[in-house]
Amino acid sequence: MVKRQISMVLDLNKCIGCQTCTSACKLQWTNRNGREYMYWNNVETHPGPGYPRNYEHSGGGFDEEGALKIGITPSAEDYGIPWEYNYEEALMTGTDPWLRPNVKPTWGANWNEDEGRGEYPNSYYFYLPRICNHCANPGCLAACARNAIYKRQEDGIVLVDQERCRGYRYCITACPYKKVYFNEQISKAEKCIFCYPRIEKGLPTACAKQCVGRIRFIGYLDDEAGPVHLLVERYKVAIPLHPEWGTKPSVFYVPPLAPPRIGDDGEPTEETRVPLAYLKELFGEAVVPALETLKTERAKKQSGAESELMDTLIGYRHPEMFKLS
């Protein structure tokens, strides 16, 4: 058992898919030395295959009895082979008239960006940012034969001991979210570290600090004065992704309140544009009361009444969104 668990809440109603969080993480951690294909933070368009491709059907996690399930390791093509461009030939020497990738791209972290489902006027999609969930019951930790993966006692952040890791990749197959990666240059597993050097200095993660939509809240689950406890424990509007996988994520999502469907008469209906059945696939049955609470509190705010929940979700100031002490 860890002493405390640091957690993150992401409000999907505010994410604009700008990829600023992805850029912040990529520039900070994964732009070199065998990490080029890795996106510790990525923003997916849903419904869609995600990153790596079809990770939701790649196995891992735990069954209903708590037994570890071993999945598959995604291929390089499922992640998207990183490429560069022929800048020298196209821009400097003029030996090639076209600027082109040096490999033929077939997939990438945001390959299906802004694609959705449905037909006009009821087509729909939403953005879903993902990092390592720093789970309370990590499949990667349970699978590691070298005891190289551990949770920090002071904050529950899940890390890989690079001295102990031998690159067996069991952690990748056991993580149902496929948020552990293999660095072929050093033959070791690597993953999101929740920017722990920043956390230790009282600073939020790079992805959270750079988020222009202010969708991310960081704090400790047991801090009753913090936004994470309020959203997860008190109002229960922040819920984990795929709770049925049994890893008990420490990253939570406020589900999207989609616009209403438009009926055949051109008028809005009571049905939401994003099907509730699809949201249940992602977040389980807890999404139903979460959405109802959001609707109720939003209506209160619209009527001019006070709403602690809505004021918190607006995120006026960073100090109110990040409680790291």
From Swiss-Prot:
Annotated keywords: 3Fe-4S, 4Fe-4S, Electron transport, Iron, Iron-sulfur, Metal-binding, Periplasm, Repeat, Transport
Where does this chain mainly localize? periplasm
UniProt-listed SUPFAM superfamilies: 4Fe-4S ferredoxins (SSF54862)
Q: Name one GO cellular component term.
A: membrane
So where does [4Fe-4S] cluster 1 get bound?
15, 18, 21, 211
What Gene Ontology molecular function terms does this protein carry? 3 iron, 4 sulfur cluster binding; 4 iron, 4 sulfur cluster binding; electron transfer activity; metal ion binding
Can the keyword DNA-binding be found in this entry's annotation? no
Where is it located? Periplasm
Which coenzyme or cofactor does it need?
Answer: [3Fe-4S] cluster; [4Fe-4S] cluster
Manner of cofactor binding, per the entry note: Binds 1 [3Fe-4S] cluster. Binds 3 [4Fe-4S] clusters.
The record, for CDD domains, names: EBDH_beta (cd10555)
Q: Where does [4Fe-4S] cluster 2 bind?
A: 25, 192, 195, 207
Q: Which residues make up the binding site for [4Fe-4S] cluster 3?
A: 132, 135, 140, 175
Q: Which domain of life is it from?
A: Bacteria
Q: Does the keyword Electron transport apply?
A: yes
Pfam families from the UniProt entry: Fer4_11
- Binding of [3Fe-4S] cluster occurs at 144, 165, 171
- InterPro entries reported in the protein's UniProt record: 4Fe4S_Fe-S-bd, DMSO_Rdtase_II_Fe-S_su
One GO biological process term is: anaerobic respiration
The UniProt record lists the 4Fe-4S ferredoxin-type domain at 6-35, 123-154, 156-185
Chain's role: Electron transfer subunit of the dehydrogenase during anaerobic growth on dimethyl sulfide.
Q: How does it assemble?
A: Heterotrimer of alpha, beta and gamma subunits.
Q: What is this protein called?
A: Dimethylsulfide dehydrogenase subunit beta
- Please give the organism: Rhodovulum sulfidophilum
Gene coding for it: ddhB
